[in-house]
Every structure is written in structure tokens, then in C-alpha cells.
Amino acid sequence: MNVTVRFLRPFARYLVPYTFHRTRSNSYSRVLQRYVSSKVPSLPCHNKDSTSPPEQLELDGWKTTMKSSIQENGVSVVSDKDEDSLAATRELIEMWRLLGKEVPEHITEEELKTLMECASKSAKKKYLRYLYGKEMMKKAKQMKKEMKAAAREEAKRARSLEPSTGEEQRDFMFLRLWDRQTNIALGWKGVQAMQFGQPLVFDMAYDNYMKPSELQNTVSQLLESEGWNRRNVDPFHIYFCNLEVDGAYHRELVKRYGEKWDKLLLTATEKSPVDLFPKDSIIYLTADSPNVMTTFKHDKIYIIGSFVDKNTQTGTSLAKAKRQNLATECLPLDKYLQWDVGNKNLTLDQMIRILLCLKNTGNWEEALKFVPRRKHTGYLEVPEHSQAAFRKLKKTKTLNSFRKGSLNVHMWKR
């Protein structure tokens, strides 16, 4: 080994720099290779022999692809979390059912999501108890329906076994009016109302003021109101204004009507009533209005707020009408009825029946028959001279000086 070192020592000054240079160049090449490999685009090398244009990298397409892949991964993670939470909720319901608690046998995806949104365990139990009672009522109705059908079949079978006397007359001079013919006739009336009828607006901008149960109650009243209007002799042209697509109202209406929603003879729009009609022709009906309705005006557009208020949020619709500078009126309940208990907010179906009766007859006594009897004790009869004196005294400050009942106002029941 010593001999080899001695032999190579004269050549050291030539070999060592060459070795250092090779090592340094190798390190530089490795650094350059890492730098180039970390960059996605590479410099195009122009070839004189090739006639094709250089290949360019589409940065926008690459960014879109990367973002979409990230979003898909995020959506998959969120969907996995939702599925896990849904499975855990189903297991919890099954465990409570095995423990003998009141939980429904069948639950939909929407009800399951509503259950997951409950904040506390007691709220979940209350909601499951509500669904259980609803399911039991549905089962009881189905059982009654089956029992009635069985009784009808039994009666029909018994009549078929009885000997016929030949005295039964089955031919009549009047044709039978089938349900399909009735629906066609009512449909023609609805078409005429949409073309020439007086508009009646239901304001659907109150979904944020109600709980889910109150909103479902409101939609039930809307369905009943639409039915009463469709069966009337001279129906209104109903507008559902401020109805957001895929909103709470819209989802519940589509759920209730199903395929018939697109066939309804009414106008559903996201626009506000002030965008469709002039403000001077609009009257907002609210129980909190200081202006009392005297007569039904056929040239006005009446608005009814689609709002079920169980928390007694007084002044909500009146405040909205004032913000939009709309005229407001309330029904003359104190003028014709001896009010007993409860507030003066009526349901939507009661309001439309009152307005339909006023539109057709103009008689307040006939129209106010649709006010529930539990809220008043009877009608008031006011003579003409007392009405004139009352109108004069109302303009003065001496009205409060009269005792109650001094204007010859007496109550009578029908």
C-alpha cells in the first residue's frame, strides 16, 4: 500500500482537481435536476426537423382539474360523514325502540335529517314521540277505512242475496254528474279567473318567522284555501308571491301537491306584490291595522299574509306593509260581533271564505258566519240612528264620556 501511494504522489496535483471538478459537476447536475423536476412546465426544445408547433401547457385547465379533484375529495368526505351520522341516528332509533320507547317504525330521510338537527336529546325524544303519534293516527285511520270498506262489502252482499221485488226504479231523468266532469267544469272556472278574475295575493315571505310545525299548518291552510276558491262560483285569481324556489314553503307545497303542483290554476312567483301591481291598488289585510274595512272593493288587490302566529308576534305584517307604504285594513269584527275570547287573527281558509262571500253577496252578516263561534257570543244589531250618532261622536272627544251600552247597542244570537 505504501508503494502505491509513493507511486501516485507525483500525479496528485493533476488527479485531485479533476476529481473535485467531477464531484462538483455531479452535485450541480443533481440540484438542477431537482429544480427542473419540481416545476411542472418544461422548456420546449425546438427541433429544426420537426414541423409540429411546440406543445403548450394549459394552466387554466390544469387548475380546474386540480380544484375539481379537491372538491370531489371534500364532497366524498362530507358525504361519508353524513352517512355515518345517519347510520348512527338509525342505530339510536332502533335502540330506543328495543327499550320500549315511543319511536316510529318507519322514518323518511327528511324526518331523519330534521331529527339530526335537534339540539338536545330531549328535543329528539319529543320529535320522535310526535312522529310516533302521527304514525299511530295514520294506522287508526287506515283501520277505520278498512272496516268501513268491509261493512260496505257486507251490506252489498246482503242486498244482492235479498229477493228483488221489481219495484226499484233505476232510471232517472237527470244525468249523473261524475267527478271528472265536475273537475273539468271547475278547471274552466279557474282558467277564466286567471284571465279575468280579481287577484288575491298570499304573501309567502314569513317562513323565517315560523317553526316547522307552524309552517306545515300554514301550508295545510293554503291547500284548504285553494280548494274553497276553486269550488266557488266566482273564484279569485290566486297569487303566491315571494315564493322562493326550493325554499321551505316551496318544498312543503310540492310535497303536499305532488304531480298536481305544476297543474294548479294559480300564479306562483318569487316577485313581491309591489313589483306586480301598483301600490295605490293594494290593500294589506292585517288584524293589527287601525283602519276598519267597511265594504269590499272589487277594483283593489287584497293581500293576506301566509303566517300562522302561535307565539303572538303582533304587528309583523303591519310593519311590513308600512315599510312598503301600502294601505292596510282589518275586518270589522267589533262592529258586527260581540267578541269573547282569543285574538282576532283568523286562519287563511276562514279569510278566503269571508272574502268570497263578500265578493258574491256584499253582506257582512253572511260573511262573518265563517268566524269560529268559540271566539264570539253573538252578533250585534245597531239601529241606523245609533250608527249615525256613533259616527258623529267618533269624530269628537266626547265618545269616552258615554257609558258602555248607552248607544242602544244590544246583542242577539243566531
Swiss-Prot record:
GO terms for cellular component: mitochondrial nucleoid; mitochondrial ribonuclease P complex; mitochondrion; nucleoplasm; nucleus; tRNA methyltransferase complex. It is an enzyme of class 2 (transferase). Its main location: mitochondrion. Its EC number is 2.1.1.-, 2.1.1.218, 2.1.1.221. It is found in: Mitochondrion matrix, Mitochondrion nucleoid. The modification Phosphoserine is found at residue 79. Residues 1-35 form a transit peptide. It catalyses: adenosine(9) in tRNA + S-adenosyl-L-methionine = N(1)-methyladenosine(9) in tRNA + S-adenosyl-L-homocysteine + H(+); guanosine(9) in tRNA + S-adenosyl-L-methionine = N(1)-methylguanosine(9) in tRNA + S-adenosyl-L-homocysteine + H(+); an adenosine in mRNA + S-adenosyl-L-methionine = an N(1)-methyladenosine in mRNA + S-adenosyl-L-homocysteine + H(+). GO terms for molecular function: identical protein binding; tRNA (adenine(9)-N1)-methyltransferase activity; tRNA (guanosine(9)-N1)-methyltransferase activity; tRNA binding. Keywords: Coiled coil, Methyltransferase, Mitochondrion, Mitochondrion nucleoid, Phosphoprotein, S-adenosyl-L-methionine, Transferase, Transit peptide, tRNA processing. Residues 186-378 form the SAM-dependent MTase TRM10-type domain. It holds the Pfam family tRNA_m1G_MT. GO terms for biological process: mitochondrial RNA 5'-end processing; mitochondrial tRNA 3'-end processing; mitochondrial tRNA 5'-end processing; mitochondrial tRNA methylation; mitochondrial tRNA processing; mRNA processing; positive regulation of mitochondrial translation. InterPro entries: MT_TRM10-typ, MT_TRM10-typ_sf, Trm10_C_MTase_dom, tRNA_m1G_MeTrfase_euk, tRNA_MeTrfase_TRMD/TRM10. Residues 133-162 form a coiled coil. Belongs to the class IV-like SAM-binding methyltransferase superfamily. TRM10 family. Mitochondrial tRNA N(1)-methyltransferase involved in mitochondrial tRNA maturation. Component of mitochondrial ribonuclease P, a complex composed of TRMT10C/MRPP1, HSD17B10/MRPP2 and PRORP/MRPP3, which cleaves tRNA molecules in their 5'-ends. Together with HSD17B10/MRPP2, forms a subcomplex of the mitochondrial ribonuclease P, named MRPP1-MRPP2 subcomplex, which displays functions that are independent of the ribonuclease P activity. Component of mitochondrial ribonuclease P, a complex composed of TRMT10C/MRPP1, HSD17B10/MRPP2 and PRORP/MRPP3. Interacts with HSD17B10/MRPP2; forming the MRPP1-MRPP2 subcomplex of the mitochondrial ribonuclease P complex. Interacts with GRSF1. This is tRNA methyltransferase 10 homolog C. It comes from Rattus norvegicus. The lineage of its organism: Eukaryota, Metazoa, Chordata, Craniata, Vertebrata.
